[in-house]
Amino acid sequence: MVLASVITAIACSTALPAQAQGPLKLLIWINNDKGYNGLQRVGDAFAKASGVEVVVQHPEAATDKFQQSVGAGKGPDIFCWPHDRAGEWAQAGLIVPVRPGKQLRGEIEDSAWDAFRYRGKLWGYPLAIEAIGLIYNKALVQTPPATFDDVIRLDKSLQAQRKKAILWDFNKSFFSWPMLAGAGGYVFGRDANGNLDPHQVGVNTPGAILAGNMLLRLITSGTLPKGARYAEMESGFSRGEIAMMISGPWAWDNAKRSHIDFGVAPIPAALPGHPSKSFVGVLGCMIAAPSKVKDIAREFIENYLLKPESLKIINADVPLGVPANKAYYAELAADPHIRATMEIARHGVPAPNIPEAGRFWTAMDAALEAITNGQQSPRDALNGAAARMLAR
């Protein structure tokens, strides 16, 4: 019924570009952990309405294949992927800018558009928003802790039950950076035009160093073990041995399958009064530069894929997490997990999307490992990370 209404609306109101006359094909790539079957169903409905065949594929090593194939003038017309590679691909000439109209801009969260902004232009259409948060077992935690000082106290109170308060993959920047960012750290500063500037780094601000000290204190106090990994965190939480973990919406299904009644809250603050700021990841669709059907790709995305009716079909296949579309989010906001994740995202910062972002992940992962293993002080480790990010 939903599909029929969408098809009728498009057939009556949408004038497809002249290119669309004839046996044309629109090729879409998306990662294999997303709702590609739902996306294909949306494409099939578009094909019935337009006469343009839509083929959805989910290749292995999709980003490598995208770069290789598009660089050779082949590959998909549309590539749906998180925003953090957009700057790299824009600089390499692999994708083209998009120019959504005022109405479409207003239908989608501003922060989601901002994630796809690079050098003053937009390079993708947002579908869904992800942000990591504190996932807590309600049977063990009545009120989620606001600070990591509270976490240390909670860990002591759980000792009698032979439980641990928290675990996360703390040597990975994606999961630990929020506590440093909340304390005043930043990845890259901005130039006079508001663009991220790789020559300005803020991973070693005084606040970031204080947050690094808190991470070390969590280790030395015994609240966190040394050398934890993601799999240990997830399995411990599923068994009810760990009260809280730091992860994203992708971890919800496993917790549900384990019959854990859980809540989602902001990551505790390293410094009181300085809330953590999670990285925000935005799944979106980009148009490949070599595509010969760019107008059709835009028509499909803007007037079909981004509509709530189509997003519902994809979400029914594999949950999108938090929809970037405001109207569809409003429908799902009754779910406390989705509502909490949106609030976390609204107070977070988009993961950097410039080509130089790779320097941050490499340097910061090494710094976190040096801190948690006791190889370097937080000050020395973060100063070293800043120096590596600035090295040419």
Model-derived features: positions:
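Mature extracytoplasmic/periplasmic domains
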Residues: I95, W250-D253, L283-G358, R379
